[in-house]
């Protein structure tokens, strides 16, 4: 069951990885009349806004199921991440893909599929739910790093870096809970083990502070 659920999630993640790049490459990278952003930067902003919603929505629902404080605490942080991205969307006069969508509803089909897969696994057990937290945070870090590489705007990079910092802290929290439950070291689920170990072997960060 575990191998099957992980395989399903990896397929969903593969689709999610290609979604923003496909959308960006599928249209001209010209500057728009409404913003100073490239089409790639716009696509990434829209995608990241909904990806943070995936995290928030999953954590809210998993808290309802398992009553683990880590889900409630991090869901609140994910709302802050969503708010930061909404501020950028408004600054650059871009439409909000999350507008009007209830918990568990997404405009991007790849993210809808990812949410559904994560929820399916997260309902299996408290252990699976915590692993879902690790999957989400590792995925966020991978996607944020890619968006930073594709961005040429300081304000966007600053926001992404702050979110990346938050995701590192969230991964530390989920890893701590998993290690306490299993007695085993945290195993990477999306990133390389080397990347994950570097994060887990460093202390919690004060994000957004210089």
List each language-model region with its residue ranges:
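All-alpha RGS (Regulator of G-protein Signaling) helical domain and cognate RGS-like helical scaffolds
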Residues: 26-210
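N-terminal targeting leader peptides, primarily classical Sec-type signal peptides for secretion
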Residues: 10, 24-25
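Bacterial N-terminal signal peptides
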Residues: 10-18
